[in-house]
Regions:
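GST-like domain detector, emphasizing the conserved glutathione-binding G-site
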Residues: 1-139, 208-233
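Alpha-helical scaffold segments in carbohydrate-active enzymes
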Residues: 14, 91, 95, 128, ...
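Non-catalytic, well-ordered alpha-helical scaffold segments
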Residues: 64, 87-90, 148, 152, ...
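Short alpha-helical "patches" and their helix-cap loops
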Residues: 82-83, 112-120, 164-179
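Amphipathic C-terminal alpha-helical segment
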Residues: 105-108, 157-164, 189
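Surface-exposed helix-capping loop/turn segments at secondary-structure junctions
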Residues: 131-142, 187-193
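GST superfamily/GST-like fold recognition
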Residues: 141-164, 175, 183
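A contiguous, mid-protein "functional segment" used to position or interact
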Residues: 166-204
Length: 233
């Protein structure tokens, strides 16, 4: 099984984190989004990552579809869940994935005012999850589930930003903060990205081109010749 990837794409990390959580063997192939190879364009109708190439040599695209396939084709992370619970989990997972690009935009903010505005949008999703979380280690209990996997890219990036730039997207949300720490402690965040993920992430989001990096005016440029928002799904 192979995942075609771009190093700092949160949609890719959702897929690779699920593969790691299920202990499924896979390989990663990174491509340049500024010079997409023809073989990739042939199997990705939207020209976006991730693409999962199954052991049966079938190319699957769109991260939502890929994670549904992995949950159906391999033993589920949480067995014996009801149809209602699975639907609820999909809804909370969707709240995460629809905010991946919101967080990406906030991380690229050129100044404090823009950062505040964009962070407020992400904060609304965080507020909703803060109210939903209980006293268990993870979203649905004491084991990692599909909702945890969906939220991991958001909380991982928030952790990296806080560590490198001192800005805390999670803020004063104690349950969300505890959940973030539990997820980081699983090791799934590090296992589901490239070894040089933090360097690549910092070069794009925490450079002198962004307020979180050094502040000041930012030019509208793209990482490695391709905007993240145009290339991830």
């Amino acid at each position: 099984m192979k995942v075609v990837s771009f190093k700092i794409c949160p949609f890719v990390q959702r897929v690779t984190a699920l593969l790691e959580a299920k202990n499924i063997d896979y390989e990663l192939e990174f491509i340049s989004l500024s010079d997409k190879p023809q073989w990739f364009l042939d199997i990705s109708p939207n020209g976006q990552v991730p693409v999962l190439i199954t052991d049966g040599d079938k190319a699957l695209f769109e991260s939502d579809a890929i994670v549904e396939y992995l949950e159906e084709a391999f033993p589920p992370l949480q067995a014996d869940t009801s149809p209602e619970d699975r639907a609820t989990n999909r809804a909370w997972s969707y709240l995460a994935s629809k905010n991946y690009l919101v967080q990406c935009s906030a991380q690229r903010s050129p100044d404090q005012d823009v950062l505040d505005e964009r962070s407020a949008k992400l904060g609304k999703a965080f507020d909703r999850m803060e109210k939903q979380l209980g006293d268990t280690s993870f979203f649905g209990g004491e084991d990692v589930g599909m909702v945890d996997i969906a939220w991991l890219p958001l909380l991982h990036r928030a952790d990296v930003v806080e560590k490198h730039a001192g800005y805390d997207f999670v803020g004063d949300r104690p349950k969300l903060k505890a959940w973030q720490r539990q997820l980081m402690d699983t090791g799934l965040a590090e296992k589901s990205v490239a070894p040089d993920f933090e360097d690549a992430f910092a070069n794009f989001y925490l450079s002198d081109q962004t307020f979180l990096g050094r502040g000041g005016k930012v030019e509208n440029r793209c990482f490695a010749g391709a905007c993240v928002t145009d290339a991830c799904c």
